[in-house]
Amino acid sequence: MEYMKGPATSSQGNILCCQCGIPIPPNPANMCVSCLRMQVDISEGIPKQVSVHFCKQCERYLQPPGTWIQCALESRELLTLCLKKLKANLSKVRLIDAGFIWTEPHSKRLKVKLTIQKEVMNGAILQQVFVVDYIVQSQMCDDCHRVEAKDFWKAVVQVRQKVLHKKTFYYLEQTILKHRLHQNTLRVKEIHDGLDFYYASKQHAQKMVEFLQCTVPCRFKASQRLISHDIHTNAYNYKSTFSVEIVPVCKDNLVCLSPKLAQSLGNMNQICICVRVTSTIHLIDPSTLQIAEVDGNTYWRSPFNSLFHPKQLEEFIVMDTDIVRDRKQAAGAGMRSNKHILAEVWVQKTSEMNTTQQYHCRTHLGHLLNPGDLVLGFDLANCNLNDEFINKMNPHHIPDVVLIKKSYDRTKRQRRRNWKLKEIERDREGMDTDDERQYQDFLEDLEEDEVIRKNVNIYKNANLPVESDTDEEGAPRISLAEMLEDLHISLDATGGEGAEMLTE
């Protein structure tokens, strides 16, 4: 008789659990899973409830010992912060998985599901899943605490200019808005002779000073005051102050240069008009159209002041004009302006129309003036000037009248102005009743100077209709192509109020 031999099969026998006696596959601990978990808790020592600190003002979480970080709910950054709270306890086990369990955002609770493994009796590896509750506790961070205590700034930039108007600061405000340098400021304070910018760090204040040096001719002086000192850690707490002084020369100012400076600028006449102030002072000689630029360092080495205040501008009426065609340029002379036309004009004060007194002068406004036009200028023949340079000049070289700019009807210009500017939120004190007139002067300067407009964001005013670029009088206006659309988040694409946000 033959027997068929089948394939040999091996089967693993079961053993009895040493605790409860149920049959189980053999394992190093000789225990079932239930008994093993009753005997050993691998999550022992890991806290099941932990607190995290959250600042409601800036919506940041505290990462010990003293760092505050921005984290979104159920983000990887927040999960990392939560696991770091358990870092010391998790060092004895192996972390397999971690993830958030959804909780109500307003419940002040965060739940993290952890999966861990650990080697227990006789080399058996046990895996366990459990949940850690994180209680979100409110705590104000140091930065917000300083803000609420009104003693939060660590650096201040004090910008000053020794003039009787604020047109320079209106221009600085617009350039700061264009480059968004106001975002790091904690507070902006406006006083009668300048602006104060407060910052939480010295680096932001230094950045503002560097920007001012690139925008206007200025100089600064830095100082600091010791607030506190920790003798154990040798840490010092300072408050820094940067005092920035802008040159006291503005657009449409009449200045008298020193003979040495005038010679270094191409042998130009000492009496000049400031036509623009950017990072340098732009000067023009109204009798020759010679132009020159003076930077901040050159100005502080050879300073000069304005001979007149803008309120001393007088109104003249043009009686006759004659364009100067033949212009001879002296040896060593500098560049001449191509945007202006030299002319000889006869003018008469509008306040002296009942007399026969007329004045003859040369002007750089030959491309704008016609007989009968009104023009603003300074009367040098009937005034007392207290300036060291002009007092030493030959009286025959001093003109009787210097014309500055053409005069237009201000009321019509304001009514037809279909654009607007944004402003920086700031604290005001010592407001002057003349501020509105000075602001209108600044707006007129923007309309007249295209170079300055390139550094300013100009927005369309939807409340006013769009008209032609020039009016009947020829007053300069800003074209529609130079304006930006003012964005309002609350408006939808059609210009109406947007619909409510869906919450379901």
UniProtKB/Swiss-Prot annotation:
It comes from the Eukaryota. Coiled coil: none annotated. Keywords: Cytoplasm, Nucleus, Protein transport, Transport. It is found in: Cytoplasm; Nucleus. GO terms for cellular component: cytoplasm; nucleus. Acts as an adapter for the XPO1/CRM1-mediated export of the 60S ribosomal subunit. Associates with pre-60S ribosomal particles. This is 60S ribosomal export protein NMD3. It comes from Xenopus tropicalis. The gene is nmd3.
